[in-house]
Amino acid sequence: GVARLVQISAIGANEGSESVYAQTKAQGEKAIQDAFPGAVILRPSVIFGPEDDFFNRFAGMTRFSPVLPVVGAETRFQPVYVDDVAQAAEMGATGVAPSGIYELGGPDVNTFRELMQQMLKVIRRRRLIMNIPFGLAAAMAWGFELVQTLSLGLIPPQITRDQVRSLRVDNVVSGKARGFADLGIRPVAMEVVMPDYLWRFRPAGQYEAIKESASRLRPQR
């Protein structure tokens, strides 16, 4: 049989949520706990790292767009480094972590807008961050979903209505939850890791630092 079980869920898992995503995460947790009471359940916030689908996605948009559209610019997140989540999962799989639910967030809490500002600073680009109101975003998402249906799934939506619902709620560790401190893990801050993998989105890529140094050496007129 299975000696230990670790489930990766998500912060915000709640059967009473308006978001289907949050509902299904909670339902999955309940099913796991019913079948395997000794399971370790991890609820990370937005995960960042070399192959993440968050910062990489938005950084990629800056290559061809002067505007960076975001939904829920003031919604708060607590991004967590993928290696820290992996370490927590390893502790659960090896029996070091006691059974139960752990909410995993990084050391910093930022709004969506602030996260985009930090990302732009790392990739050395200036873009207008445009907040899209939830009502307009929901209407746009409906259109994207319609296109997906008409294309028989060949054209995926840029955003879904359920994602818009999720973005209405802060994605941060709750005050009473067990987390990294209970596991003895000190989470890594975003600014330590982001330059290591987002440099390729800089205007001159890996040569951006050389370009900046050269510009400082030019004689002033």
What are these regions (language model features)?
Residues G135-R221:
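A hydrophobic C-terminal alpha-helical subdomain
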Residues R76-D83, Y102-V122, N131-W142, R186-V188:
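Substrate-binding strand-loop-helix patch
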Residues G1-A35, A39-S45:
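Conserved Rossmann-fold NAD(P)-dependent oxidoreductase catalytic core, especially the SDR/UDP-sugar
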Residues G92-G106, R125-M130, L154-P157, R178, ...:
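Core catalytic loop region at the nicotinamide-binding pocket of NAD(P)H-dependent oxidoreductases
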Residues A59-G72:
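A short C-terminal helix-loop "cap" of Rossmann-like NAD(P)-dependent dehydrogenase/epimerase domains
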Residues Q23, D53-F54, G72-T94, G100-E103, ...:
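Substrate-positioning beta->alpha
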